[in-house]
Amino acid sequence: AFLHDSLAGYYPLSLTERARQISRALHAHLPADYPQAIRLLLASSRVSHARRAAQGMGGFLFMPHMMFIAEHGLDHFEASMQAQHELTQRFTAEFSIRPFIERHPEATLARLAQWTQDPSPHVRRLVSEGTRPRLPWASRLRDFQRDPAPVLALLERLKDDPELYVRRSVANNLNDIGKDHPDLLADVARRWLQNASPERRWIVRHALRSAIKRAEPGALSALGYGAAPTLAIERVRIEPKRLHEGGSVDIGFELHNTGAHSQSVMAAFVVNYVK
């Protein structure tokens, strides 16, 4: 019966629709007692073939588990948090954790603060990725868009994490924050760059990437590009003059420093397309 309900009309469905259908089938066939149901789900994830399947794209096997927790576990905080701690090491709990942030903000943030020191990089990454205000594929965390201070407190604990996997998530979270609070992002960038390791400098530059594209003054200043440049642009060359689909264009020019001192310069091209 479980297989029948899981696979009914399965193949035309999208990835998330398939996972949601399996999650509904789990709810229909697992015990009604949530803690007992979670124990069974976790037991199924611990068998050897499930651990092997969690490698690579096989981790999506556990997407229905996460949906089940998000939809039915909000009234069972401790059991659900323990389950997400274990399952996120097989498939990310960045989506399922968000309803708990909204329903139980203080308790969830306190648990996430503990997890910043967890031995598993998957758990530490969850702290950052799950609190992103604008996480792709997920509903926005509006409270964190208005006031990202609770998120920044967590990111402070992760900014020197030994795993690039975690640091990249920290940078992406800051990039999200900067879309709503550009001045705050610039302030964090300047502070983090003080006596920064190469790894932390990478976080800052990656976090500022969208702000730099928008030419935001605070972001440019944080990276040393704030002053008005004294430059002359000469010998501009664009070849060919006409371009066919699939072709390439070469752009060349010379930049001359017309001032008395050395300066840091960021050059960017603006391309306009005929519509």
Region locations from a protein language model:
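Contiguous segments within soluble domain cores/interaction surfaces
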Residues: 229-231, 258-275
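Short beta-strand segments of immunoglobulin-like
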Residues: 237-243
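Short beta-strand elements of extracellular/lumenal beta-sandwich folds
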Residues: 245-257
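Surface-facing alpha-helical segments and adjacent helix-coil boundary elements at the starts of domains
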Residues: 1-219, 250, 261-266
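Hydrophobic alpha-helix feature that most strongly marks membrane-spanning transmembrane helices
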Residues: 212, 216, 254, 272-274
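Long, positively charged binding patches that form subdomain-scale interaction surfaces
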Residues: 237, 248, 260
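Helix-loop elements that line ligand-binding/catalytic pockets
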Residues: 232, 242, 251
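Proline/serine/threonine-rich low-complexity linkers at boundaries of modular beta-sandwich domains
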Residues: 218-233
